Amino acid sequence: MNYKANIDMKIIRNSIIPFKGFCAINLFGVIFARHEAYLSETVLNHERIHTAQMKELGYVLFYVIYLIEWLVRLLLPGNAYRNISFEREAYNNQRNSFYLERRKSFAMWRK
């Protein structure tokens, strides 16, 4: 099995991270979820895709690029968050449970 498809993630439930209004956030391959949040398979797959992206680029570089892209997209029309390349890949494929088995390297920047 492809290493990208077999991504186990630790889940930490708490009442601080993420902020209210969000159910989960992936920080360095660890899911932080609110106590009351239901983590569907779709949400978990979305976060698995982010973990694959992080491992591919390295955690620090992932966050540097993510932040820069978000700041640039704030100046452009549309939803800055949803238009970040990492988020587009994750949202477009979060319902495909086999996506990580066939994901190509640097898929977030491929058409």
Question: Where would I find each of the regions flagged by the language model?
Answer:
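Short pre-active-site segment immediately N-terminal to the catalytic Zn-binding motif
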Residues: 21-44
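Metalloprotease/metallohydrolase-associated module, dominated by Zn2+-dependent proteases
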Residues: 1-22, 26, 57-111
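Residues at structural and domain junctions
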Residues: 30, 50, 75-76
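Active-site recognition of the HExxH zinc-binding catalytic motif
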Residues: 42-54, 90
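Hydrophobic transmembrane signal anchors and adjacent membrane-proximal interface regions, especially
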Residues: 3-5, 9, 37, 44, ...
